[in-house]
């Protein structure tokens, strides 16, 4: 069963938070968000992953406005305090209200990209069936994922030109997954 704490990157296995840890180096805890407007003028996506057994975090934010695309990628050593693993370089995810509202900020002047956008859920989170895959006797994948729809508000700025994000026309989805992959 998914609980509000499952929205944080604190999982120790492919199961919801209350279960035991794994030493598998492919254990991960990841966010993915996307947004687009109904006119096709903007598309953006964020991916952020924590790989605790490798002591690595990474993040990527991409935006397309008109015919211009800007991408920001960052990687860092993972903080041992899992509650401090929602910021990598210039990209951060803030859980404003678990399973309801998430804020993304990007501040990368060297790429000419800044953003402050918030996704407000328009659906309950859907827990997908646990996925498991083996290669012979070896487990290669075993993870849980939740997916959710929402509307976006805020702004994205490229080279000083700000684009307001209107929740009436900018929708998207997100997923959270954790386990071994």
List each model region and its residues.
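Targeting-peptide/extracellular-domain and disordered-appendage signature
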Residues: 1-181
């Amino acid at each position: 069963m998914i609980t509000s704490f499952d929205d944080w990157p604190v999982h120790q296995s492919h199961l919801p938070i209350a279960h035991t840890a794994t030493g598998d180096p492919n254990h991960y805890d990841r966010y993915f968000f996307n947004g687009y407007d109904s006119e096709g003028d903007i598309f953006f996506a964020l991916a952020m992953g924590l790989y605790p057994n490798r002591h690595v975090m990474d993040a990527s934010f991409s935006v397309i406005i008109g015919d211009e695309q800007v991408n920001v990628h960052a990687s860092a050593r993972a903080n041992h305090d899992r509650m401090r693993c929602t910021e990598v370089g210039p990209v951060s995810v803030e859980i404003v209200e678990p399973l309801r509202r998430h804020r993304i900020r990007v501040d990368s002047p060297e790429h000419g990209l800044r953003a402050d956008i918030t996704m407000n859920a328009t659906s309950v989170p859907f827990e997908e069936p646990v996925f498991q895959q083996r290669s012979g006797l070896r487990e290669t994948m075993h993870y849980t994922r939740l997916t959710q729809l929402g509307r976006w508000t805020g702004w994205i700025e490229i080279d000083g030109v700000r684009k307001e994000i209107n929740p009436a026309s900018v929708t998207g989805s997100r997923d959270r997954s954790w386990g071994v992959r």
